[in-house]
């Protein structure tokens, strides 16, 4: 029996997702598979390629032939070079770790709460100087008014 390592298409229209499968060469593209050995999601950035390396190595060793597309994927992951005894390829582009959305939300909420609380709390004022004489601060009632002070209080314009 001729065995192939090929892609089985899954997913939606315009959003393909593939499983890397071991199948008889005479079966349909999306037909029954002998074994599932990985996934390939080309629409992700970077593309997701997950392969069960030990199972692929086994199937290659017993004579399974990869399709052209699968062979390119195996070259990117380094499994093809491992099988052929060639030097390993350069490392793949790795997706950055995603930030936990709940933790990020809570951190933003705490930061916003900290900013909102700051204006509501009055700042501590410096204590007033008690040594300053109070006589200069408030004018005495029996002191004679100057012309400027007297004119400002009356409605006369001059």
From Swiss-Prot:
One MF annotation (Gene Ontology) recorded for this entry: structural constituent of ribosome
Gene Ontology terms describing biological process: translation
Pfam families hit by this protein: Ribosomal_S16
Keyword line: Ribonucleoprotein, Ribosomal protein
Low complexity: compositionally biased ranges: 111-121
The keyword tRNA-binding is assigned to this record: no
Region (Disordered) residue spans: 111-158
Biased composition (Basic and acidic residues): 127-148
One term under GO cellular component: cytoplasm
HAMAP family: Ribosomal_bS16
Similarity remark: Belongs to the bacterial ribosomal protein bS16 family.
Name of the molecule in the record: Small ribosomal subunit protein bS16
Organism: Salinispora arenicola (strain CNS-205)
Gene label: rpsP
